Swiss-Prot record:
Main subcellular localisation: membrane
Organism: Methanocorpusculum labreanum (strain ATCC 43576 / DSM 4855 / Z)
Higher taxonomy: Archaea, Methanobacteriati, Methanobacteriota, Stenosarchaea group, Methanomicrobia
Protein name per the record: CDP-archaeol synthase
Pathway listed: Membrane lipid metabolism; glycerophospholipid metabolism
Protein family (similarity comment): Belongs to the CDP-archaeol synthase family.
E.C. code: 2.7.7.67
Catalytic activity entry: 2,3-bis-O-(geranylgeranyl)-sn-glycerol 1-phosphate + CTP + H(+) = CDP-2,3-bis-O-(geranylgeranyl)-sn-glycerol + diphosphate
Role noted for this protein: Catalyzes the formation of CDP-2,3-bis-(O-geranylgeranyl)-sn-glycerol (CDP-archaeol) from 2,3-bis-(O-geranylgeranyl)-sn-glycerol 1-phosphate (DGGGP) and CTP. This reaction is the third ether-bond-formation step in the biosynthesis of archaeal membrane lipids.
Signal peptide location: none
A GO biological process held by the record: glycerophospholipid biosynthetic process
Subcellular location(s) of the protein: Cell membrane
């Protein structure tokens, strides 16, 4: 999940400039995504996530770190891209519900990137015929369940921690 956890904070650091929705509004009169989703943040976040994923591939191979999932270029790119796409889908629905940028939406805010990254990775593996990636990395049901539990516990903690740091650094308007 490293390539999925990195893009959101990287997008906040590198963001700014032209919004992904180009300032356009949906039929309800509200912005499609809002000013918080920019092309610079989207592209920068994905690139940084991919770089971290490539480092994970290198470390796995060089140091034989078998406790890490054996990532591929496909999984790294899908995880990094899916994390930010999941965040944008969540932002779209937040706007439809009338929630402002930075407004709390607890469950969605914590797991949007997890859902987006895992859905896109699964689709990418399906399209490329590499669904065996799951059985290669999760050789037992117990390990798969332990991984899911770790993701469910770590995601909110990492989300909250990075948001507090972003707030303290002046990169976010709110600490959540």
């Amino acid at each position: 999940m490293i390539p999925a956890y990195i893009p959101n904070p990287a997008a906040a650091l590198l963001g700014g400039g032209t919004p992904v929705d180009f300032g356009k509004c949906a039929k309800d009169g509200r912005r499609i995504l809002g000013d918080g989703k920019t092309w610079r943040g989207l592209i920068g976040g994905i690139v940084v996530g991919i770089i971290f994923g490539l480092m994970q591939i290198f470390l796995y191979n060089y140091f034989n770190l078998e406790f890490l999932p054996k990532q591929t270029i496909i999984t790294v790119c899908a995880l990094a891209t899916g994390a930010l796409l999941g965040d944008m889908v969540k932002s779209y629905f937040k706007r439809r519900l009338g929630k402002d940028r930075g407004a709390k939406w607890p469950i969605a805010d914590m797991y949007d990137m997890v859902v987006g990254s895992l859905v896109l990775m699964t689709l990418a593996l399906l399209v490329t015929g590499n669904l065996n990636w799951f059985t290669e990395n999760f050789d037992s049901v117990g390990f798969l369940i332990a991984t899911i539990i770790a993701i469910l516990i770590l995601s909110p903690l990492l989300h909250r921690g990075t948001n507090i740091i972003g707030y303290l650094l002046g990169l976010k308007d709110v600490p959540w």
